[in-house]
Amino acid sequence: MKRIFLFLATNIAVLVVINIVLAVLGINSRGGTGSLLAYSAVVGFTGSIISLLMSKFIAKQSVGAEVIDTPRTEEEAWLLNTVEAQARQWNLKTPEVAIYHSPEPNAFATGASRNSSLIAVSTGLLDHMTRDEVEAVLAHEMAHVGNGDMVTLTLIQGVVNTFVVFLSRIIANLIARNNDGSQSQGTYFLVSMVFQILFGFLASLIVMWFSRQREYRADAGAAKLVGAPKMISALQRLKGNPVDLPEEMNAMGIAGDTRDSLLSTHPSLDNRIARLKSL
């Protein structure tokens, strides 16, 4: 629940900060509906796009991932060769491959585009899983890259953020209007922030739902690439090993929650396994 709260709080905080900065600069949302919608889009997409462009840098710094430029061990060479082979099957430029030190088995993919991406695995993943299972995990992350999930998630977040800002301003405009047609600036700003937080929470449910669907899709992509048995085996292995990632990276990891929830970024491992068995 801590991860979920921080995920929601971070997105809402970004919206609030951007609004405050624009207000300080004298850039406001007054005007017609078209102007308000344009203003809302600027606010809604700015944070998401910046996060996307900086995603590889943030990911590396968050977990201390070390990119493999020249393999130093047979295991590193195998990782590079496996990712390169999978990238060819997707007709993609080979992503950067990195390892980060963590006892928990996990992996994630990120990047600004399908041909500018990063796939990172933990030392715990390499220690706890067989080569077949690691291959399946890499295929799952490659499916995220090939499906363009990072970009799509950014666009969805930007769209919902836009409507969060737009609707909160519309309601604030109605509530803050005085009988003589004037408007209380303080009331307008306060009401818009309150509704922005409320709508931000509700909008996050949409983003979480999409995140869960993309996990099913990535599992299916991995099954197509390496076979469902390998992917099922990898997920079953994860069930016995609790995992953790920094809060800002959780949506990109492979591990899921023990139960389904509207606020989960991943479906439960049991449901993912059941979905794979039905393919």
From Swiss-Prot:
Note on how the cofactor is bound: Binds 1 zinc ion per subunit.
Active site, UniProt feature: 141
GO MF terms held by the record: metalloendopeptidase activity; zinc ion binding
Binding site for Zn(2+): 140, 144, 215
Keyword Lipid metabolism: no
Entry membrane topology: Multi-pass membrane protein
InterPro entries (alphabetical): HtpX_protease, Pept_M48_protease_HtpX, Peptidase_M48
UniProt-listed GO biological process terms: proteolysis
Named cofactor requirement(s): Zn(2+)
UniProtKB keywords: Cell inner membrane, Cell membrane, Hydrolase, Membrane, Metal-binding, Metalloprotease, Protease, Transmembrane, Transmembrane helix, Zinc
Principal location listed in the UniProt entry: membrane
Domain of life: Bacteria
Cellular compartments annotated: Cell inner membrane
Segments traversing the membrane: 4-24, 34-54, 155-175, 189-209
PROSITE patterns the UniProt entry points to: ZINC_PROTEASE (PS00142)
Keyword match Metal-binding: yes
Enzyme Commission designation: 3.4.24.-
GO annotations of cellular component type: plasma membrane
Protein family according to the UniProt entry: Belongs to the peptidase M48B family.
Protein name: Protease HtpX homolog
Source organism of the structure: Neisseria meningitidis serogroup B (strain ATCC BAA-335 / MC58)
Lineage of the organism: Bacteria, Pseudomonadati, Pseudomonadota, Betaproteobacteria, Neisseriales
Gene from which the chain derives: htpX
